[in-house]
Amino acid sequence: MTNIRKSHPLLKIINHSFIDLPTPSNISSWWNFGSLLGICLILQIITGLFLAMHYTSDTSTAFSSVAHICRDVNYGWLIRYMHANGASMFFICLFIHVGRGMYYGSYTFMETWNIGIILMFAVMATAFMGYVLPWGQMSFWGATVITNLLSAIPYIGPTLVEWIWGGFSVDKATLTRFFAFHFILPFIIAALAMVHLLFLHETGSNNPSGLNSDSDKIPFHPYYTMKDLLGMILLILALALLVLFFPDLLGDPDNYTPANPLNTPPHIKPEWYFLFAYAILRSIPNKLGGVLALVLSILILALLPFLHTSKQRSLMFRPITQTLYWVLVADLFTLTWIGGQPVEHPFVIIGQLASILYFSIILILMPISGHIENKILKLN
């Protein structure tokens, strides 16, 4: 008699995805972040659901409802800070996950990679709308500034902005619809993640060497279930450390002031995980140009499969491109720092140079270094 997990229609899917899945025997801890993202998503949906039970999406009561959650709801402060800092952990895992994909050439799985890019946009949209909900100063002005960028779209821009706002400014209608979208998007993200996995399991996982690993596969359970479990414990430990000791470390003090349309904060800036894109946006003096650069800063990932010139898939044995990769990582840290600084000298010029370097490395230098490495190894 066959095992129920191999014959039952539903258990069979779970079995092929998490138990008997043939997995390369040499994948490192950098491959843990996919499962960690899944844990982050589940955590965000659960904490978000409990927050939604007590939150009111009305401009007059939104701010005080968040204060009420923290003061009067049992462990409300814990749920609120787990949700807020859980978003930060989500993005840390997301950036590492994408970075690993870039380093080891996982973008050659085109369908998986493109679904991943769509997922990234969806997660960013969700996080942005979630930041608006507490209705503090930075929530209001962040929403105003970022939605206003759409007015740069020729012809339909201004109408589009008013349509998104549901009026002539960010107001009650905007907050209500942002809450509705913030609630529904994580479930869409969960569905997209399933599609992401579906496409991944069509090809099988990549591995650090970038070589075909069909001859050396091991079952996912117990090897990688245990390995993922360790990652999850460390993730929850890091989140607990952040939530219980430094809950406001990554937040903005301005968001503890209720939203006031008549008083602009001195420095309007988004959450830390958007600062690199915000720095790229600000480094271009033209509004439309800035918006295009902002979108391209993420959309450029879709070009990676076409910009791959090397005969090798992974960067493991490619020292020149490896160096460029780490320069790119350092550049992203620089952009993140610049995004949080005021618009004045020398930050403006540093931001512009860092933005030029970001696009140059991906579009020009990495493809050239791939060619050079082929020549050195006489692979042409």
Swiss-Prot record:
Quick one: which residues bind a ubiquinone?
H201
Q: State the Pfam families in the record.
A: Cytochrom_B_C, Cytochrome_B
What is an annotated GO biological process for this record, any one? mitochondrial electron transport, ubiquinol to cytochrome c
Q: How does it sit in the membrane?
A: Multi-pass membrane protein
Report TM segments: 33-53, 77-98, 113-133, 178-198, 226-246, 288-308, 320-340, 347-367
Q: Which PROSITE patterns does this one have? A: CYTB_CTER, CYTB_NTER
Q: Which GO terms describe its molecular function?
A: metal ion binding; ubiquinol-cytochrome-c reductase activity
Where's it found, cell-wise? Mitochondrion inner membrane
Q: Which cofactor does it need?
A: heme b
| Residues given in the record as heme b b562 binding sites | H83, H182
Q: What does this protein do?
A: Component of the ubiquinol-cytochrome c reductase complex (complex III or cytochrome b-c1 complex) that is part of the mitochondrial respiratory chain. The b-c1 complex mediates electron transfer from ubiquinol to cytochrome c. Contributes to the generation of a proton gradient across the mitochondrial membrane that is then used for ATP synthesis.
Mention any additional remark: Heme 1 (or BL or b562) is low-potential and absorbs at about 562 nm, and heme 2 (or BH or b566) is high-potential and absorbs at about 566 nm.
Q: Which family, according to UniProt?
A: Belongs to the cytochrome b family.
The protein depicted here goes by the name Cytochrome b
Native source organism of the sequence = Brachyuromys ramirohitra (Gregarious short-tailed rat)
